[in-house]
Amino acid sequence: MNRILGGLCLVLISYSAMAEHHGSEDADLHAAIKTFDHAYATNDVETYFGYYADDATVYFYGARQDVDAYHEEWTAMMEAGGGVEKNEMSDLQVQLMPCGDVAIATSFIDNRTRSPDGTISTARAFETDVWQKIDGEWKIISLHYSDIPSEE
């Protein structure tokens, strides 16, 4: 009986240590998500693109996009006077995988963007980001952004 109780205590201690480890991973991940979203909302191009893994895949506007081309387009839009005026995330759901180094974050996005000619566009969308801890840093390995049609 003592062996069983001792084994049970060892298992429970292991789970406790894993929970503490995942707690710090979860805090780091939430900080990365918040910083990534804030960088986009404030037109901080380099911080925003710094969160993408080198081989990340992104999908928006109905097609897979090249991250380098996306970076160039966004930089050019900022230099020409365009930019994001609003990018609010809501209903954030984060699922940290048991391994602790992969997570899926989903949220609704309310966006308002100004083109260089001053035209304002608004969108409501659903975004899914797949994050992976690479060399100790959380990076986006895949992002899928889908517009939600407005109800008129």
What are these regions (language model features)?
Residues 2-10:
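Sec-dependent signal peptide recognition
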Residues 14-16:
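N-terminal signal peptide c-region/cleavage motif recognized by signal peptidases
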Residues 23-32, 45-101, 108, 122:
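A solvent-exposed, acidic/Ser-Thr-rich amphipathic alpha-helical stretch
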Residues 36, 43-44:
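Short helix-adjacent coil turns
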Residues 52, 109-111, 144-147:
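Short beta-strand segments enriched in hydrophobic/aromatic residues
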Residues 111-115, 131:
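Beta-strand elements of well-folded, non-transmembrane domains
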Residues 124-151:
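Short beta-strand edge/turn micro-motifs at domain boundaries
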